[in-house]
């Protein structure tokens, strides 16, 4: 039995230099599991000639109700006016966003026999960022080298991928090493109660009937032909047409690693072929803002879901004159963000400019790159 939904009256507050700004008619706070950093855009009303004491590079916190959901920096504070309205639009992103476009620099550029949290801490420490470990990070990495000109985000994601860890950022702006969907949110998505609108966002465009990975090994216990011709394959039984995909693993690999790669690819692409975007009333559920990376129960007979728990992988909280305060939730099966220790990365060129930190190979360009 699902408890009856009761709408909360939460407010979004922007806290800059100790001053809380709230009570506007438009706002947007966007967080996504595939982007390392959250973003915000909020116009603040002002009296002409008396602009608020907010400037670029100021530290900022975004609160929904009493809960901090984003800690970052102001990137723009631009004035605007029109008939009957005057204000300043404040836009920015969470602290970890600094890693997206900046280069990774570390003395020597190499680590030996180091765990991934040490590698990642060394990369992000110059940016003033902390690292929070929320999962098992596995054994040490024997050798890790920075690529020349490699971005800090790419280096962090590559290190995490070696041990099957998902990289995101938390509400305090720290880099978070975690897994997908380890917690369940107390709220539910219920058609006829808190749902305003829903649309399906799934597609089989990126799925294949069989995934075939090839690689080479320098294992001295194997004969030459075995080492040269490692191969693993996995089938997606739901794809009935002949749609094979070959993945070429760069660098030294093993049979077990190739098998992990193809099975992981099946799960992730299948998970990403399914999804829904829900618009729900309000910004919170029983006083708690809708969270990222938690499972949520969905009761929707149109979607064919009766209590199934899907992963919240996108949260956008908005306010406008038409809809009031609403939250857009993107949900997918948890397996869409499955993680597994991988040396090989299948390149993706459709990430946009926010940076991708997920541990899965999918996308339009499926040539493998060494990790």
Model-derived features: positions:
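An acidic/polar, Gly/Ser/Thr-rich interaction patch typically located in mid-to-C-terminal regions
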Residues: 22-53, 196-371
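Short, compositionally biased
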Residues: 75-83, 181-183, 309-321
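Short, charged, solvent-exposed linker or helix-capping segments at domain edges/interfaces
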Residues: 100-106, 187-190, 323-324, 340-345
């Amino acid at each position: 039995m699902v408890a009856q939904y009761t709408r909360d009256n939460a407010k979004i507050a922007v806290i800059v230099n100790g001053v809380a700004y709230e009570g506007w008619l438009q706002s947007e706070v966007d967080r996504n599991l595939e982007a390392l950093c959250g973003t915000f855009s909020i116009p603040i009303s002002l009296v002409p000639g008396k602009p608020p004491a907010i400037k670029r590079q100021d530290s900022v916190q975004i609160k929904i109700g009493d809960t901090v959901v984003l800690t970052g920096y102001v990137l723009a504070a631009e004035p605007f006016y029109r008939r009957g309205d005057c204000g300043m639009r404040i836009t920015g992103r969470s602290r970890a966003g600094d890693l997206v476009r900046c280069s990774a620099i570390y003395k020597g550029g190499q680590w030996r026999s180091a765990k991934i949290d040490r590698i990642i801490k060394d990369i992000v420490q110059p940016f003033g960022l902390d690292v929070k470990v929320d999962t098992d990070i596995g054994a040490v990495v024997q050798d890790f080298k920075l690529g020349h000109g490699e971005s800090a985000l790419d280096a962090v994601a590559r290190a995490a991928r070696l041990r099957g860890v998902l990289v995101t950022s938390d509400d305090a702006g720290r880099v978070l090493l975690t897994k997908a969907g380890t917690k369940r949110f107390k709220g539910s998505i219920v058609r006829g109660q808190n749902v305003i609108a829903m649309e399906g966002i799934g597609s089989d465009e990126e799925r294949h009937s069989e995934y075939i990975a090839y690689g080479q090994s320098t294992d001295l216990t194997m004969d030459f032909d075995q080492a040269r011709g490692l191969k693993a394959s996995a089938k997606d039984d739901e794809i009935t047409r002949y749609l094979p995909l070959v993945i070429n693993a760069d660098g030294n690999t093993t049979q077990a690693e190739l098998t992990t790669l193809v099975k992981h690819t099946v799960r992730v692409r299948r998970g990403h072929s399914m999804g829904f975007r829900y618009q729900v009333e309000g910004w919170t559920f029983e006083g708690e803002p809708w969270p990222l990376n938690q499972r949520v129960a969905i009761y929707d007979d149109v979607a064919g879901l009766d209590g199934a728990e899907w992963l919240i992988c996108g949260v956008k909280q908005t306010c406008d004159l038409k809809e009031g305060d609403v939250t857009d939730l993107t949900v997918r099966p948890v397996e869409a963000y499955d993680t597994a220790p991988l040396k090989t990365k299948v390149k993706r060129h459709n990430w946009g400019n926010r940076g991708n930190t997920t541990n899965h190979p999918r996308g339009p360009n499926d040539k493998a790159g060494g990790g």
